[in-house]
A protein has these predicted regions:
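Solvent-exposed loop/linker segments at secondary-structure transitions
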Residues: 35-40, 80-83, 266-450, 469-478
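C-terminal motif of bacterial Sec signal peptides marking the signal peptidase cleavage site
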Residues: 15-18
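Bacterial N-terminal signal peptides that target proteins for export
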Residues: 1-8
């Protein structure tokens, strides 16, 4: 496909003009849509990875990366996930998406997980555009083109001109590390689209798409609110929803998550610009593997395995993602720091299960993939209680609930409102993520230990001194 250079927002006024095809022939275009891939190129289960999906597209849709009558789009959150992607800060996923033939991705909140320099590098490596019309620098109000982001791009394919616009969830300010994105403003969706559309209209596109990292709960009302703007398709993201339906004159797609499924829409565009469409969703199952895509996956698997193959422990039965694993992680913080009274982490920072059998360094990178560090704060009992009340899904070590009060597990003493305690949290929380703003407000002088938040868990696993003949088993109901 011939992809024009992404165009930044200029906010100039232009008249809305109808466009038409240059001749009387109908044009066909199939949109293939995924989102929230999160680095799962190998697949969550056998035979549902990226190479399987690519083969499925070839078998079911007739797709190829250089086909002129397809456009492959993503709703964002491309890379944070298993070690094959997290260890290299998404570089492997960009190469994979280049190979598969993506044209554009919305910017998801997790695109910022590894810092602004990382997203700048990834966008430079990508043969596709990273799009967000509602992201701007706070000090200038300008689109962060210096990070490689664009508001929209124009794509010429199948004899059609497409305008593809991106949106980023407004939750990004607290759903990635707030310290990373503190200089960025994630603006109102409707206002951003209305400000941009005069410029988009001046491009005289045949079809206008909005790909977004926005959940259906917000996206469906937005489609109604901007129904006058002539947007033909919206794509969803962020909430892992699989959907293909029509709202008025607009098609809505959501591709699910982790390459386990996709959504599609096939447009037939007449010479007068009118169109017909059919749409559907499809699970990624039953296909073989595309050799070219598989080669990329295997090469990155080999590279990550070489660095991350150290066996830390042997587990009988594994531990599912959830409360037990969360507790093991936060308990390990206190195990590593005997000076701390309490440890609190957010459940959202724990992203994968502890597998059965060998547990490698790579497995723990997938479980705890972020660049967060452990921060020590001094909080009163009253402040701790408030943090636990306000923060999202806290996981706690060093405290237990007795009736209506908190008690220290070391001493069984009740948490005293005015007494100070040393509390370990992660840097995402200390920066205000997941509604933990009170931490820095209560102790502005929090001490960043510099310890990556997964390191105590790795040290603890090593300390168990397990083996293949003497694995440890964790009781889910102690």
């Amino acid at each position: 496909m011939n992809k024009l250079k992404p165009i930044a927002v200029l906010l100039l006024l232009a008249s809305l003009a109808a466009c038409s095809l240059p001749d009387s022939a109908e044009r066909e275009l199939t949109v293939l849509y995924t989102n929230d891939e999160h680095g799962w190129m190998e697949g969550m289960d056998e035979a549902n990875g990226a190479a399987n999906l690519m083969q499925l597209w070839q078998d079911n849709e007739g797709y190829s990366a250089d086909a002129e009558n397809f456009v492959l789009l993503s709703g964002g959150d491309n890379w944070t996930g298993p070690a094959i992607s997290t260890w290299n800060q998404g570089e492997s996923m960009v190469e994979l998406m280049n190979t598969m033939g993506y044209e554009a991705s919305a910017v998801g909140n997790h695109e910022f997980d590894f810092g602004l320099e990382a997203i700048r590098q990834r966008s430079a490596e990508a043969n596709y555009a990273y799009l967000s019309a509602n992201t701007a620098w706070r000090d200038t109000g300008r689109l962060p083109t210096d990070l490689g982001l664009a508001a929209y791009e124009i794509v010429d394919t199948a004899g059609l001109k497409l305008a593809v616009i991106g949106l980023t969830t407004r939750e990004t300010s607290t759903s990635t590390n707030p310290a990373t994105v503190g200089d960025l403003d994630f603006r109102d969706y409707e206002a951003s689209l209305r400000a941009l559309m005069p410029e988009v209209a001046s491009q005289r596109a045949d079809l206008t798409f909005v790909i977004s990292h926005v959940c259906l709960e917000e996206l469906e009302p937005l489609i109604e609110q901007v129904s006058d703007l002539g947007i033909d398709l919206f794509g969803a993201g962020h909430c892992n929803e699989l959907v293909a339906k029509r709202i008025g004159d607009t098609v809505l797609l959501g591709g699910g998550f982790h390459f386990t499924s996709y959504a599609r829409a096939k447009f037939i565009v007449a010479a007068d610009g009118s169109w017909q469409v059919d749409y559907s969703t499809q699970e990624n199952r039953g296909a073989g593997t595309d050799a070219k895509t598989l080669e990329v996956v295997e090469r990155w698997r080999d590279q990550s395995s070489a660095a991350l193959s150290e066996v830390l422990a042997y587990i009988d039965g594994g531990v599912a993602r959830g409360p037990l694993l969360d507790q093991l992680v936060v308990d390990s913080w206190l195990h590593a720091d005997s000076t701390a009274d309490i440890a609190i982490t957010n459940a959202g920072g724990i992203r994968a299960a502890l597998p059965a059998g060998e547990v490698t360094l790579g497995d723990t990178v997938a479980i705890l993939p972020f660049d967060n560090t452990i921060v020590a704060v001094e909080l009163s009992g009253e402040q701790i209680a408030a943090v636990l009340e306000e923060g999202a899904r806290p996981r706690i070590a060093g405290l237990r609930r007795v009736n209506e009060s908190w008690h220290l597990t070391k001493t069984e003493a009740p948490l005293r409102p005015t007494e100070k305690y040393r509390v370990l949290v992660n840097s995402f929380m200390y920066a205000g993520g997941d509604n933990y703003d009170r931490l820095a407000l209560s102790d502005p002088e929090g001490y960043d230990t510099g310890t990556q938040y997964g390191e105590p868990f790795r040290q603890w696993l090593r300390s168990l001194e397990t083996s293949s003949v003497q694995p440890i088993r964790f009781n889910p109901n102690p």
